[in-house]
Amino acid sequence: MTRIVGIDLGTTNSLVAYMKDGQPCVVPDRNGRAMVPSVVALTDNGLIVGDSAKEHLTRNPERTVYSVKRFMGKGLTDVQSELAYFPYQLTETGGVIRIRLGEKTYSPPQISAMVLKELKRRAEAYLGESITKAVITVPAYFNDSQRQATKDAGLIAGLEVLRIINEPTAASLAYGLQKHTQGTIAVYDFGGGTFDISILKLKDGIFEVLATNGDTHLGGDDLDRLLVDLFIGQIQEQHGIDLSGYPDHMQIVRLEAERAKIRLSDDLKTKITIELPNDKGHFTRELTREQLESLAIPVIERTLAPCRMALKDAGLTPKDIDEVVLVGGSTRMPLVRHRVEALFGKAPHCHLNPDEVVALGAAVQADILGGGTTDMLLLDVTPLSLGIETMGGVMSSLIRRNTTIPASAKELFTTYVDGQTGVDIHILQGERELVKDNRSLARFRLKVPPLPAGVPRIEVTFLIDANGILNVTATDMRTGQSQSIEVKPSYGLSDTEVERMIEDSFKFAADDVNARKLIEARLDAEALLKTTNKSLTEAGHLIAAGEAEGIRNALSQLTTAKDAADPRTIRARMADLEQAAKHLNVVMLDDSLRKSLQGKKVTEVT
């Protein structure tokens, strides 16, 4: 049976998971790390993804892309207020956001596909088999455009996306599998760039989503920005430096803000140290948890309104909730947990790793689709109402939000003008009454014979599949003529573009693998050169002159090999250097131990 993996494609980090002996497990890298930073960087050697790309955030910020999930299925006008926070260049072509990296531009699905390819490669290396099918998670409040963009990313990465599943729902699957529980649960999902709340009923292996709500532009990134604005303002005030003109230092500030936020989940205070440009020294200050929380309160309070709305839509009160499950790294903040407990009147469930639980649940759903797990059934819902434009610029909803999917709905419409020869079907998504306040998904035209107004009968059918993606058919009931469309997002990619990207991914697959091997070898070589040079400088006097000269020769040979285009040669010279420096490393360790024990009594070290 072909293995199907579960993927959590996150704003900050992404993970891939699989089922082993009936339990979901995340796939680690060779260093045991499960999370792949959702970062892509363009280097002189090509595109890199993950941890190695993250290192370029401060080195080369204009050519390093992060938080691309915030742009999925969106146009430039949707994210106008955020542009100042991103050092890389964003443009728009045909309503699609494009991200410039060097001479080329990429759409958000293309960047996301690079992250998915890395997850695919990691899973294949770990499991020892080809991976071609996956379940990918999205925020529950992602609209049709964003879901289609995610599916496009999977296709470009060479994955057959069997199911798009909502992140809170995935988390509930992992939770239900572990706890074997019954009852009503609330899944509070506060990630890097999005927030979701879902209310589910668990009974006899059936996971029924009762209601969902959220904000696809609310997450840990927003907390980081509060600190960034604070630090930048204080640097301007104290040192007279406007960091907005220094993209590399802006990234240093952003990363320090993120690290400080994380530290303050465990500590009551932390020290902030930020290097200033042009050798102007450092900005330092102490930041307390209380100060962070005073800044964060408005952001965290914004998560509570969707919670109340979801409860209302489900016809429940906080007392009806049996368990609250926390998902997403941002839920590690003590203030978040305190506010969630205050809202629901019970301490949240914190035993599952909030960073991994979504990927684990996706693996469970993948196993269900593959026929491995047969005693669990998932009944998800559509997060937003779907409908069409009617006379006067009003939206008529056919499928209401929180309807269990897959779902279908039909409604009859007619013409309003005598002799009308066609009907324009304008498909919308949203909760507002007027067309202008909702999101336009697609338009198409149905031809009708010229008849008096009100005579034609046009049946419009909406069919939303288990991925939350919509198909619409309009039929003239008098003639039987119909017109159908699979709704493509206004800010999405055309079929031709996606097909071209998929063809390119296969066409250049071998070149991509070789380029990747070369990039990885060069990066590893640079790291080895740096550490060995440092060791030789600090401890060269502890070894014989001839041995030190041998290390220098090996360093020189690796430096030369690093610029070649053969990863095997680079790896061979790395092995030579590691062998040449083996005794130096032992001597350094002995010297370090000797210094640490110097002057101590036996009783102090036993």
Where are these regions (language model features)?
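Oxyanion-binding/catalytic loops of NTP- or PPi-dependent enzymes
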Residues: 1-95, 101-114, 121-606
